[in-house]
Amino acid sequence: MSESGPAYRRAHVTELDSLPNELVEAEWKPVRGAFGIDAFGANAYVAGATGELVIQRHVERKVAHQELYVVLAGEARFTIDGEQFDAPVGTLVFCEPRADRTAHANEPGTTVLAIGAAAGKQFEVSPWETQRTPAA
């Protein structure tokens, strides 16, 4: 983030651009890129229909990111290490890097914010993100 210009920015998730992402069915909104965040990863996923994949199944073995998911709208069904549970709006779900996780929308408009970084390390953008975002 630059030292010049405003010290804060704001936007509604619906105002953020969506980019193509073959990993999920929901709209991918690269929050980190929209705000120029360089200390942690941040992405939003907005489902258009019930059952859409909002968080792809994955484990953070390579980048070792701890991840926090925040359900901003609707309700998501998470499956983490084989345990399934519903997460209504306002739910926070924290995953250690070793957790095998995925989530689907239980209703249209379900919106999940994902925030992540590796503990104790300088943040590096995940390879999956750099492969899917336009060059700066």
Model-flagged regions — what are they?
Residues 75-77, 84, 100, 109:
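Structural motif
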Residues 82-98:
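Short acidic-glycine-tyrosine-enriched beta hairpin
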Residues 38, 79-83, 106:
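Short strand-coil-strand connectors
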Residues 1-53, 132-136:
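A short, N-terminal "cap"/entry segment at the start of jelly-roll beta-barrel domains
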Residues 47, 61-78:
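Short, conserved beta-strand element in jelly-roll/cupin
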Residues 2-13, 106-136:
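Double-stranded beta-helix
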Residues 39, 65-68, 109-110:
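Short, surface-exposed beta-edge/turn micro-motifs
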Residues 54-60:
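Short, surface-exposed loop/helix-turn segments at secondary-structure junctions
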